[in-house]
Amino acid sequence: MKVINVLAEPKRMLIVELLRKGPHSVGEIAEELGFNQPQASKHLKVLSEAGIVEVEAITNKRIYKLRPEPFQELSVWVESYLKIWEERYDNLDEYLKKMQLDEKRNKDDS
């Protein structure tokens, strides 16, 4: 999953968290996060190529904002794993209840 690989880089994740608050220019992102502008631009390029952000040119600024689609896809992917773990948890819960019941029966039989 390309989105996960891109978001695994901590500085890119900081940018995404900042963009959750709303669109920002490269300069604003760099200033807010304490990056130099080329560093911010490099990370924004990767985020853009992965389809995580989109850019709009307004006068002489490039404004970046998050795209919802990659996060919706990521949510669906995570949900599929949550269902597996919930089923496993339910099975474990049933097994533990059965063990407790068996243990109680054994004590009652003694």
Question: Predicted segment positions?
Answer:
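Pre-recognition alpha-helix immediately N-terminal to the DNA-recognition helix
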Residues: 13-15
